[in-house]
Amino acid sequence: MRLDRFTSKFQIAISDAQSLALGRDHQYIEPVHLMVALLDQNGSPIRPLLTMLDVDVTHLRSKLGEMLDRLPKVSGIGGDVQLSSSMGTLFNLCDKVAQKRQDSYISSEVFLLAALEDRGPLGQLLKEVGLTEQKVSQAIEKIRGGQKVNDPNAEELRQALEKFTIDLTERAEQGKLDPVIGRDDEIRRTIQVLQRRTKNNPVIIGEPGVGKTAIVEGLAQRIVNNEVPEGLRGRRVLSLDMGALVAGAKYRGEFEERLKSVLNELAKEEGNVILFIDELHTMVGAGKGEGSMDAGNMLKPALARGELHCVGATTLDEYRQYIEKDAALERRFQKVLVDEPTVEDTVAILRGLKERYELHHHVEITDPAIVAAASLSHRYISDRQLPDKAIDLIDEAASSIRLQIDSKPESLDKLERKIIQLKIEQQALSNEHDEASEKRLQALNDELNEKEREYAELEEVWNTEKAALSGTQHIKSELEQARMDMEFARRAGDLNRMSELQYGRIPELEKQLDLATQAEMQEMTLLRNKVTDNEIAEVLSKQTGIPVSKMLEAEKEKLLRMEDVLHNRVVGQSEAVAVVSNAIRRSRAGLSDPNRPIGSFLFLGPTGVGKTELCKTLASFMFDSEDAMVRIDMSEFMEKHSVARLVGAPPGYVGYEEGGYLTEAVRRKPYSVILLDEVEKAHPDVFNILLQVLDDGRLTDGQGRTVDFRNTVVIMTSNLGSSRIQENFATLDYQGIKSEVMDVVSKHFRPEFLNRVDEIVVFHPLGQEHIKSIASIQLERLAKRLEEKGYQLEVSDKALDLIAQVGFDPVYGARPLKRAIQQNVENPLAKSILAGEIVPDKKVQLIVTNDQILAHQ
């Protein structure tokens, strides 16, 4: 008997039978070994055949196990296992049956027929479980679909639809699909295209996350509920699993063979199956090698002849990139465009999905949370689509609440740690016998008893609250199951079961749920089980860094005192500080225009008066770190071609994939302070880019992505008109100086640019008293640096006056002060520390002697 006459699956089963006999110390491979190997085989071709014939496979497998146990064992055979004579007879019978059926190869199911013809114990057992030659022969015809076995891999390609597709209608019947709310027009249009005589293949196109797959799931649910035209009733919607189709296709032509078997089975179904191909663009080029066809080209004939009812889904970009390039494939599909739903539609979708998420997370989702998820995600997450981004917020907020319920509350956790700490101390003191230790031990025991009693009470409260929450969830699960049972009964036309559920079980469960919910509504001390708009805002703030959660009292207080905080570092510029503070307060109070940046300012003034320092202070105030500021030195953008660095290089240029300097920074941190330093030094074309940012709060980068600037503070600094400020500072008031400066500024910048800036702020030159305040601030920073090293610095008033006097320059502002502190304070201090004249842990005083500052200890 030639082994190459068997199919590959049958050959693997024979090898498995040999291993089985060897492992059980059997001298011969009997037919029962092969039958067990065929049943236990991964992707067994025998199992579906027996299931079709209503055979209890588990019972058959246990009977075969008993037969194996009765076979004689031979020890010391040394791995020499041979085919038994009955096995040889069966193989000859298999060959005879295969020839009778005109098969080129002997397949696994032929072995079943041969075993039934044989009079051995295996044949007897198969007859006992209800198999006959006629029944098996008919089942083989059905499974093969009238085809002969002319390929060693024929068994692997059988039942291709079961292996390589997922039945969406079956999942809809089982209630495993989420409800599809809205989208009626798109589903109706899809049905309309499917009803056509030719080109009845819709392709659903839309941005990622708008619900393309949900439309097909909605179609499957309508088919199950008989809410479709006569022509589509009873059809199955199968989703092609491209992963399963490609996985394990090692040899050339294997992928094509699998796809061909899927198409052949679909052709046999004669239009009763609608094939859904998610990510349709993956079919173009899939399986393409040198000179071979890709999957897209294999689909074309079936699509053209109408043998294949296909629904595709892909994004707009991928449709353009892959499908439109292949005009022959594109013309066989009919486009169904899916737009992003509105905020109102998203709220309706979320209300429909609410129960599923409540059941999964075992928490309650409130209606304000649903409205907040839709509106906040629409406003603050600009790079993704509704309803996907809103569903994500609901899901994550519910997950965070569930995490808090499942994990130990913070108060309990702290108590437990304290108790452990006290027990360790108790153990240490119990070994000491002096009077002080015994007194401490007595006090410790009292404290420990108190803490343990407190812990026990809190734990009881926690367990009670958890039990109350789990009770409602159990009822909700039962109610969901009862509703699904009622849906099954409605489809089956079982009126008795329907009335029993509708008027008995469901109202009873709803009543129980109401009672449990009322008990749950009592104020909980440790646990929260409701997702509110606050939780949604918290999740959004974590995702984007934008503070949208309700302000705590501390933050409100901080915002009201914002000017005082900024004045701690920025001296003498009250107008600028007031303008910036008001913009931030408007934003956090929710009053600013949602379609523009939080604020856009042009700071004008001479060098060293605090323009850049105010930006750093603002970033530090808003984000507790100066690093949160996106600082762009505009003197780097003096050439025309350097403008592309801000938004990214255009296609075809080096660096296209990297993105823009400004756009990438804002995409990563949508809530930030953007400082465009020395803006007048930039090329005029840069201001054309800024027009869109200042007016609409958006900018399109080199790759066509829209970047959202609506949550940024844009600050531009410039030295324009500083000479006019110096000339007129003594004679004119603030408004007079501002009009003089604007005269210079309007000649340099275009009107459309200046018109879009919220506020143009002119900074004053700094006077002697301002320099003294700044000197005090800078010496405080020096004192902090010295404190880290162990030195305590004290500055006398005379020393402070001298530093302010030396560092004062009306033209250069506060910058000379830094040099004055370096030369007059830091240099002598450094020498004294290195010489050992100043030692740590003692006060260091700065005093003035003969117009010189000396460090004295």
From Swiss-Prot:
Keywords: ATP-binding, Chaperone, Coiled coil, Cytoplasm, Nucleotide-binding, Repeat, Stress response. The keyword Ubl conjugation does not apply. ATP 2 binds at residues 605-612. Residues 391-525 form a coiled coil. Residues 766-857 are annotated as: C-terminal. Residues 341-545 are annotated as: Linker. One of its GO terms (cellular component) is cytoplasm. Signal peptide: none annotated. ATP 1 binds at residues 206-213. Residues 6-71 are annotated as: Repeat 1. It is found in: Cytoplasm. Part of a stress-induced multi-chaperone system, it is involved in the recovery of the cell from heat-induced damage, in cooperation with DnaK, DnaJ and GrpE. Acts before DnaK, in the processing of protein aggregates. Protein binding stimulates the ATPase activity; ATP hydrolysis unfolds the denatured protein aggregates, which probably helps expose new hydrophobic binding sites on the surface of ClpB-bound aggregates, contributing to the solubilization and refolding of denatured protein aggregates by DnaK. Belongs to the ClpA/ClpB family. This is Chaperone protein ClpB. The gene is clpB.
